[in-house]
Amino acid sequence: MRSIKTILAVLLCGLLAAGCIRAGGGKAHYPSSKPLTRWWWFARIIKKEDVKYNLDWVKNNGFGGVEIAWVYPLNRKRFYSEPLDTNYLPRQEWQSPEWSSIVAYAKQYADSLGLSCDFTFGTGWPFGDTKVKREDATQTWHEKNDSLKWTYAVVSWEYPKKGYIINHMDQRAFDRYAQRMASALAPAMKGSVSGLFCDSWEVETSRIWTTGFSEAFKRSYGYDINPYMDSIYSRANFDERYDYMKLVSEYVVNRFYRPFASECRSLGSFSRVQCAGAPVDLISAYTSVDVPETEAMLYEPPYSRIVASAACLTSKKEVSSETFTCTYGFPRYDAEKKRMDFRLRGKEQVADLKLVADALFANGVNQIIWHGMPFNPVGIDTIMFYASVHVGRKGNLAKDIPAFNSYMTKVCRYMKQGVTFSDVAVYLPVEDSWETGLMKEPDTQQPWAWGEYEMRRTVPPAELRGYNPIWISGNFLRNASVKDNKLVCGDETFSVLYIDASYIDLDALRTIVRFASKGLTVCLRQVPRQPGKNKSPEFSKLLTELTGMKNVSREFPGKTGIKPLVKGDSLPDFWCRKNGDEYYFFIANPHSMDLHLPLKYGQSFSSDTIQRDLTFNVSGRELKLPVEFRPYQSVILKIGRKGDPQYLDISYDPPVPKTEPF
């Protein structure tokens, strides 16, 4: 029976991928807009009374639910210079009946409180454990040892045991892993619907490989990739690198992300996924799952526009965010290089967090997942997680969490109204990122980030700021259509396709020419080249045909007549939703612009009211308004069919932040 359900789910996922029906169909997967919190279960004996103790606090502090994440035992010393403690602490064994039982109890008790209860689909970050066989483990080109195959032993529930990370390019490896995980979670899947979570990509990506890849590559591209692999990231091999990355993306999306989403649906669940860091066409990956999720601050807020765009293109209501991760920076060693500096942990300030939340709302996020709450036994609140703010009974945030949660709930409720509104689709330069290879400007805050393929710093062109532009990739364009001279994707229609890319894939160019011939206005800001090793004479012919059309121009807005949704000097970041004839604008306080990791302690401090004179163009009307931002306040403006503006009450005054923690 389960195999039939899985087949049906795979067929459904294929229809979604083809753009035949809407993924999610605008369905809300969470019963409320209240924030959830990630809830770290450290590897130990988990007791029912402790589960109840934690969940009661969650309920009483304005949360909508939890996401249970299984991680390391507390004796392992991850961030100290001395050797790791490898003594084995007692715990419910991973995926054992005892483990399944206590997980099911947590779900049942959450249900009794009216809380959502999601689960990570594994332990640690990437999927894997000690039961993964070597033939199912992740691979890289010319492996010299197994060091890159192991799970992050120091973050796994099974620590100090080592297990393999699954091969994300082999669906059979995923299927075998998923069967075990689904069986262990089965008792907990009863009751309300639980989301199943996949974290951001933390698998070795450099020269990622799988059995049969070489043969598949030759069939697809007509040449042998093997001679290029040792130097695939060199500048000389940019075209070969593009072909390699394109096939890797197809493998990962079709053999991991789509199967994961299908598996979740077959279990009566839904997928919530971070595709950040994956070697993929991000729009294709994020559109394949039910609830696309971003994260901040390890990915800065503007990145979230990619995630929210994927939701918009497939009519998904929710865009979630793992929020407040490493807000003040990733923990670092102290001056003596002996211990990690955790002095700000537990001293976080809610005004600083509001800066981050508002920046996310202005980039399309409408469901907050706190990062997060460590599991603490009854009467204890001294256990903390290393890379997050502290959600718990003690710490600087404790007294402010209920009111802050109420604020975020209110904003998210408004920003789930109707659908995202935009009139401009902007081409996501995936091809450029793959041709570029290594990051042009490595991030000293995040030395593990090395490839442009992550698109960490990709933002829309400055001239589109007032248009609330939506990213679309060349690969996803084939799922769209043109009707009445407009680009149609799910519930969304766009009057203009804006392209500012150095490279465009041949298949994408064919689609663009076809759409332009049907009347779609295209802004082609530069003359692109064909990526990949195999050049086709068709490319230049198509480009000549495209640039010769009257509805194709190098200028924007040019003769399109399209006005920006919002116009004004020093325009703040904003997001727009439309519900029937009503428009909802979330306009972030200007202090939420240009946030970078790490935030300074007390960066949110402000004493001045800021005014922006803004012009709104909706429903054929031009509305000029002075918009006032009091200290720490953002704005939601509702504009009705007749152009009547209404400021919605989302006021929340956090405590004035300190600028020095000690």
Positions of predicted regions on the chain:
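Bacterial N-terminal signal peptides that target proteins for export
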Residues: 1-8
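Bacterial N-terminal signal peptides
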Residues: 8-18
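Bacterial Sec-dependent signal peptides at the C-terminal "C-region" and cleavage site
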Residues: 17-28
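Boundary/entry segment of secreted carbohydrate-active catalytic domains
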Residues: 27-44
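Carbohydrate-binding surfaces of carbohydrate-active enzymes
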Residues: 35-36, 47, 51-52, 65-66, ...
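N-terminal cofactor/phosphate-binding cores enriched in small/glycine residues
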Residues: 37, 44-87
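A solvent-exposed, charged loop/short amphipathic helix patch at secondary-structure junctions
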Residues: 85-87, 161, 442-446
